[in-house]
């Protein structure tokens, strides 16, 4: 199978990534990737931008190098299940990932992580949960993924985690999470988690996982741009006028 949307990418605005959005779009165009979400880290992450950065994404063209640009953010899960972007930002974004990051949310125990994830899902402010395979943030797979399925929040399959070079110990957990998502009928999304433009749209590990467990493609929201946009509509997000031509 081929993934056509990358829902987790970073620019140098994240503080520890190395490309501009134009460079990311050019790399995507060279790869033949028709759409990606730009999802820089929210402000609690060291080096990340002020929330005005996300409000002002309205100035971004909807297409750069003929690649569709989805305006997004990777928010940090903090406290007992909040995210670190003000509610006033929500209307400026098309796509919000919520993730645990050690500098913001020190690793605790499975119950605390599970409760935080469920609270984030039920807030209805996030569209996906990012890189859940991290063993530092163990959680009750069944409880969280069942809640995500109920609220139509996507579970991210993260290609960087599956490489085994960061968030060490994630690979087997990613496979198990995907199997639980398949069993419970949850949606999954796919993120390169690119911090450099040459990694945009690179999904060899994720595609292998999807093939290995025969994950149903109608639940992979990034299989086509139309499936991704249909998922945004399911989430209650307003249609993006400039993307109407992609709904075929």
Swiss-Prot record:
Please tell me one Gene Ontology term that the record gives under cellular component: cytosol
Q: Tell me yes or no: is Nuclease among this UniProt entry's keywords.
A: no
Keyword terms, alphabetized: Hydrolase, Metal-binding, Zinc
Q: Name one Pfam family in it.
A: PHP_C
Metal-binding listed as a keyword = yes
Q: List the disulfide bonds.
A: none
Q: What is its EC number?
A: 3.1.3.-
Which GO annotations describe the biological process of this protein? Answer: bacterial-type flagellum-dependent swarming motility
**Could you tell me one molecular function GO term of this UniProt entry?**
phosphatase activity
Entry cofactor note text?
Binds 3 Zn(2+) ions per subunit.
Any idea which positions bind Zn(2+) 3?
74, 101, 131
Where Zn(2+) 1 binds, per the record, is at 8, 10, 74, 193
Q: Which CDD domains match?
A: PHP_HisPPase_Ycdx_like (cd07437)
At which positions is Zn(2+) 2 bound? 16, 41, 195
PANTHER family cross-referenced by the UniProt entry? PHOSPHATASE YCDX-RELATED
UniProt similarity note: Belongs to the PHP family.
Q: This protein is called what?
A: Probable phosphatase VF_A0774
């Amino acid at each position: 199978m081929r993934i056509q949307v990358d829902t987790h990418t970073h620019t140098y605005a994240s503080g520890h990534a190395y490309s501009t959005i134009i460079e990311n779009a050019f790399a995507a165009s060279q790869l033949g990737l028709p759409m990606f979400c730009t999802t820089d880290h929210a402000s609690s992450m060291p080096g990340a931008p002020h929330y005005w950065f996300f409000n002002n994404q309205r100035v971004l063209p909807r297409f750069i190098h003929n690649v569709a640009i989805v305006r997004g953010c990777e928010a940090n899960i903090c406290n007992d299940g909040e995210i670190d972007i003000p509610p006033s930002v929500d209307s400026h974004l098309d796509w919000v990932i919520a993730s645990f990051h050690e500098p913001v949310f020190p690793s605790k125990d499975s119950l605390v992580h599970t409760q935080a994830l469920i609270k984030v899902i039920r807030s209805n402010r996030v569209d996906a949960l990012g890189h859940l395979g991290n063993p530092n943030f163990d959680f009750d797979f069944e409880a969280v993924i069942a809640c995500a399925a109920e609220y139509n929040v996507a579970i991210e399959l993260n290609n960087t985690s599956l490489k085994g070079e960061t968030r060490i110990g994630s690979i087997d957990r990613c496979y198990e999470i995907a199997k639980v998502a398949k069993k419970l009928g949850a949606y999954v999304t796919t993120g390169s988690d690119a911090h450099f433009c040459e990694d945009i749209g690179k999904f060899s590990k994720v595609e292998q996982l999807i093939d290995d467990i025969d994950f149903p493609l109608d639940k992979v929201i990034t299989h086509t741009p139309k499936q991704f946009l249909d998922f945004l509509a399911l989430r209650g997000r307003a249609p993006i006028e400039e993307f109407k031509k992609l709904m075929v």
